[in-house]
Amino acid sequence: MASLGSAAAGEPATGAEAEPGPPAPPPPPPPPPAPSPSALGPLLPLQREPLYNWQATKASLKERFAFLFNSELLSDVRFVLGKGRGAAAAGGPQRIPAHRFVLAAGSAVFDAMFNGGMATTSAEIELPDVEPAAFLALLRFLYSDEVQIGPETVMTTLYTAKKYAVPALEAHCVEFLTKHLRADNAFMLLTQARLFDEPQLASLCLDTIDKSTVDAISAEGFTDIDIDTLCAVLERDTLSIRESRLFGAIVRWAEAECQRQQLAVTFGNKQKVLGKALSLIRFPLMTIEEFAAGPAQSGILSDREVVNLFLHFTVNPKPRVEYIDRPRCCLRGKECCINRFQQVESRWGYSGTSDRIRFTVNRRISVVGFGLYGSIHGPTDYQVNIQIIEYEKKQTLGQNDTGFSCDGTANTFRVMFKEPIEILPNVCYTACATLKGPDSHYGTKGLKKVVHETPAASKTVFLFFSSPGNNNGTSIEDGQIPEIIFYT
């Protein structure tokens, strides 16, 4: 190697006479240009001769391998990323140096790539489907266990970690997403969780949507979800939203989906893209006013469907409709039920008078329905109005005009409210049921106090009191309304 001040190659030394000889050889070709710096940090120059004693400054194995990250030093493979569409705008493809041994030690996919039966010997490997930032995050983790992810890179890093089978980095990505999960991004993250098969993250997204349904469906990401994700959400019994508002949300989604499919936004096309999702809206849970103001005028339902639903709202006996009438109970935990009678007898008649019983509880609960006795004459349909009234204020907190079918046994049959009804501790309420149908079974040997116990919760204590008036004969001792169905 020439030292500073020495003569240039091919030139005579100063003060010496040039002797004749053969012509000088042509100058060597210029060295190839160094690779362009990465947009994510400059690459080190190619080091064919190792830096002397760099190891002495690195006290730990982690420091030594971290020093080799994204470095040409001792590297034996390069990855070419950013080819194809968008590469020119990003300054061309990026070449990232790496070390086969380190990659194979951290990833079964890299191990197979370099050491398996179809191992590659190429010094450059193209990765057209991987983002440079995500790939560098993967390499950084393999070299140093360091995690560098952010809102802009977490999804591509998760994809890359899955592609190269690095579950520890996957877990860090999922943890990052979980910490940043909110109602306004729950649908976006749910779509990604389903795409990347992350059931734990998907479950957390669904829980967030359950608790904050209105905020979640109001976010921009809601209209971007796919039809399968939409149906998965609409099937849930735990959404906390009025059904009329949920219908408005799926109409917005249908309009966006028509545009994605380059279809005219017409009533017919909205119905077409909704498909099964439309049948998952629980129209019977709406009031007749909500139905008339929204779905009936939307043009998405057929005339026959609109007529059948109006009949369902207005006439008795109610015609069957092809829509779910099970309430969406936006409550956590397990459903509970208490029965206030110890024995069942036959023949309880109905003449239009309501069966009533008063009760209090010692803790806050949410009542979702009653269990009622059915016919002594075999399979029968009943029409029924159920209510819960706050006794002192004479305020109706919830009611439902509905029906139920019984099989002639002495069992109870569930009749549910459209929405959960909050019951406060030590406040007196009246449970009311007005039945139309044949004579039924009834309960006897009633209890004034019923205690419900669960391993995970404290005791729920019900106290029962007879209501003033006729009440069709129902009292503490005997009558109808044997069961209260609730959540704590």
Curated annotation (Swiss-Prot):
SUPFAM superfamilies: Formin homology 2 domain (FH2 domain), POZ domain. The keyword Cytoplasm applies. The modification Omega-N-methylarginine is found at R85. GO terms for cellular component: cytosol; nucleoplasm; P-body; protein-containing complex. Residues 190-290 form the BACK domain. Its main location: cytoplasm. Signal peptide: none annotated. It comes from the Eukaryota. Residues 75-151 form the BTB domain. SMART domains: BACK (SM00875), BTB (SM00225). It is found in: Cytoplasm. Coiled coil: none annotated. Residues 20-36 have a biased composition (Pro residues). The keyword Cytoplasm applies. Interacts (via C-terminus) with TOP1. Interacts with TRIM5 isoform Delta. Interacts with CUL3. Probable substrate-specific adapter of an E3 ubiquitin-protein ligase complex which mediates the ubiquitination and subsequent proteasomal degradation of target proteins. Seems to regulate expression levels and/or subnuclear distribution of TOP1, via an unknown mechanism. May play a role in mesenchymal differentiation where it promotes myogenic differentiation and suppresses adipogenesis. This is BTB/POZ domain-containing protein 1. It comes from Mus musculus (Mouse).
